[in-house]
């Protein structure tokens, strides 16, 4: 059995990269607190992890589109007397289409999930970690943080925020004993694109997708090594590097071409 005091909290922990990260923590004998919207998916994931790795898995079904969601998760974990040694902010969504045709209410929800929840969880748990001089935080950002994303303008913007925000906070706590790591995946084979109505984008429909297990491994190893940031995948590293040296308008044009819909209709659907 895992050490009763060694817990990792993972948002978006029932699927995709978050689920693969949960497996890696469990292999290293971390107990888990998994947060997602679907109780059914959480229960299935928890049962599999408990059976395979013999760890304790607590699940919290919570809608992190709601600003109070992270606070409620924090209070519930605290009420159970659980100390979080590792925080993984992974839950996130996007929306595909030209900004003039996308749904503003959906975008405001995405901003709350991709930024609000990250900032809240980071604030609440970083304060505890700094006070005890130990802890690790993994922020799942995106390659999109490094480059503008036509047809995903809000999503890329939220990820640029997360990377910039994390780099600033990391500097503030650099001598505290707490490490904060950024994981920037590229296109990964998860349900993200279905939720974003993005399956018709050329980069998704015709391009290759990374295995979420490989992405999770890159992030987990970087987290445990105390690294600042990892871009997962060689070609993504190349694209991130080019994004930092080429003119912004050229990068935006290249990304626009990659994200074009196969049906030619860029409007949100």
Predicted regions and their residues:
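Conserved glycine-rich cofactor-binding loop
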Residues: 12-16
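Conserved glycine-rich Rossmann-like NAD(P)H-binding loop of the short-chain dehydrogenase/reductase
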Residues: 28-44
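Conserved NAD(P)H cofactor-binding loop of Rossmann-fold oxidoreductase domains
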Residues: 90-95
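Substrate-binding pocket helix/loop in short-chain dehydrogenase/reductase
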Residues: 98-100, 106-111
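Active-site helix of classical SDR
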Residues: 122, 158
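Residue(s) in the substrate-gating loop at a strand-loop-helix junction
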Residues: 142
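SDR active-site lid
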Residues: 172-235, 245, 249, 253
């Amino acid at each position: 059995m895992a050490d009763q005091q060694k817990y990792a909290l993972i948002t978006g922990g029932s699927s995709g990269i978050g689920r693969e990260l949960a497996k890696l923590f469990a292999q290293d004998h971390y107990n888990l607190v998994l947060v997602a919207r679907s109780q059914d998916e959480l229960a299935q994931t928890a049962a599999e992890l408990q059976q395979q790795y013999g760890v304790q898995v607590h699940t919290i079904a919570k809608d992190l589109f709601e600003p109070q969601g992270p606070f409620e998760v924090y209070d519930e974990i605290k009420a159970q007397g659980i100390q979080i040694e590792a925080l993984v902010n992974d839950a996130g969504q996007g929306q595909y289409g030209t900004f003039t045709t996308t749904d503003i209410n959906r975008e405001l929800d995405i901003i709350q999930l991709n930024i609000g929840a990250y900032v809240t969880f980071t604030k609440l748990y970083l304060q505890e970690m700094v006070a005890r001089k130990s802890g690790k935080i993994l922020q799942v950002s995106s390659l999109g943080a490094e480059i503008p994303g036509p047809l995903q303008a809000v999503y890329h913007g939220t990820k640029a925020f997360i990377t910039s925000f994390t780099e600033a906070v990391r500097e503030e706590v650099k001598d505290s004993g707490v490490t904060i790591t950024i994981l920037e995946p590229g296109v990964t084979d998860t349900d993200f694109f279905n939720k974003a109505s993005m399956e018709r984008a050329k980069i998704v429909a015709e391009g290759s997708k990374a295995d979420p297990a490989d992405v999770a491994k890159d992030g987990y190893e970087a987290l445990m090594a105390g690294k600042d940031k990892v871009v997962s995948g060689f070609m993504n590293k190349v694209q991130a590097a080019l994004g930092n040296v080429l003119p912004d308008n050229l990068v935006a044009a290249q990304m626009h071409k990659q994200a074009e819909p196969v049906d030619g209709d860029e409007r949100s659907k």
